[in-house]
Amino acid sequence: MLQIENLRKIIYKHRKELHSIAEIGLKEFKTSKYIRDYLDKINVNYNTYLDTAIVGKINGKIGTKTIAFRSDMDGLVTDEGVKHLCGHDGHMSILLGLIELINDNKELLNDNIVFIFQPAEEGPGGANELIKLGIMEE
């Protein structure tokens, strides 16, 4: 079972890596690959949308309710290049840690968990595009 101190280290590692590859909205290709590679490593299923968005689900034993967790993915353009200045690197890292914790304890899970890594939170509006694609209906 994943221990809290190990989880903290994993989240910090994710944040450091994701901070170093900040990308603008709808062009989060390195970021998306990093997340997909990690989800593959921990054997969590997902689908991709809009080239960079990632949506996955961990099924609970009962599964009559579904709880969703979302993280933004994009950085901001600055005079020094693209940077994570709004904490999106932290949001993604925390969500990856939560996914791993839930996945490691899924035998205790009654409800379904959906996770959404949403591109273009800062613009041009990745959430609206994902909703139009029907991710909230699945």
Q: In which residue ranges do the predicted regions lie?
A:
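Acidic/His- and Gly-rich active-site-bordering loop/insert found
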Residues: 1-110, 114
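Acidic/histidine-rich catalytic neighborhood of metal-dependent amide-processing enzymes
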Residues: 96-138
